[in-house]
Amino acid sequence: MNYLLISSKKDPASQNIKRHLENYGYFVHELEKKSNTSKKSDFHDSSLYVFLSKHRSESKKPTLTVHTPGNLTKDNSHGGNPEEICHCNPVFNTLLLQNIDKYNSMEEYQELGFEVSFEVLHHGPTDLNAPSAFVEIGSSEMQWQINDAAEIITNALIDTINAISYGDFEEKEKIIGLGGGHYSPKFTKLALKNEYHVGYLTPKHAKLSENILNQLITKQSFDFVTIDWKGLYGEDKKIYIEFFEKFEIPWKRV
C-alpha cells in the first residue's frame, strides 16, 4: 500500500506520534503549517494520507479518535474548501479504530483512561485525491504529551498498515453513517463490534446539501447507507431518503 504519514511542526501531539513512528523506522512527512490548512500541492501522490494530530475539546476528556476530513457546509474556517470532503477508506478507518481500542484496552494502558471513538467529517484539508484520515490524541495539552498515548496510536497504525498491505483482515459490508453526535457513538459501537467497515460519518446538526450527498456516494466505496433513526431530524431523514431512493442507493435504519 502506497501511504503517506503526515505530521505538523505546529502540533505537539503530532510530533509525539511522529517520534514514536520514527523509532520504528517509519518515514513521516513533516509540515511547517497546521495539517488542517494543508492542500494536495503540499504532498506527493499517494493512495492514502494519514494525518497525525491533536484533538481539542472543552471537556478535556482523554480521547483517541479517527475521522476523515471534510467540510459539510460552506464554512471552511478550519481549512479546506467549502462543501468539500476528502475521499474515505472505510476499511482503513475501521481497522485503525479497532486497533487503537485493542491497545488501549491492554492492562498497561488502563490507568490512562482514554476513550476511543470516531468523529464525524470536519475541517480541512479537503482537496486530496485519495482517501485521508486523521488519527488524534485528545483532548488537552496534557494528553498530547503522553508517550503511552502516542505508543498506542503508533502500534495501531503499524498493525493497520500491515493488515491492509497483506490483505489480512475480514471482509465486512462497507457503510456510510448519517446522524448522531460529533463522536458518532452508534457507529463507533458498530465498528468496535466488528459488524461493518464504517466510512463517512455525518452528525445530526448538519443539513446535508445535494452536493454533499453526491460526494458521500461517489468518494467512498460502500454497500449501503445507514441512518441513525433516532439521531436525525425527521425533515432531514425525509430529504436524505428521497435522495437515496431517487438514485437507487440502498439504505437501512439502525
From Swiss-Prot:
The UniProt record lists the EC number as 3.1.1.96
Q: What class of enzyme is it?
A: hydrolase
| Residue stretches spanning the membrane | none
Reported cofactor(s): Zn(2+)
Question: Which key words are in the record?
Answer: Hydrolase, Metal-binding, Zinc
What is the recorded name of this protein?
Answer: D-aminoacyl-tRNA deacylase
Q: Which SUPFAM superfamilies match?
A: AF0625-like (SSF142535)
Gene Ontology BP annotations: D-amino acid catabolic process
- Its domain of life reads Archaea
Q: Subunit comment for this entry?
A: Monomer.
Q: Pfam families, from UniProt?
A: tRNA_deacylase
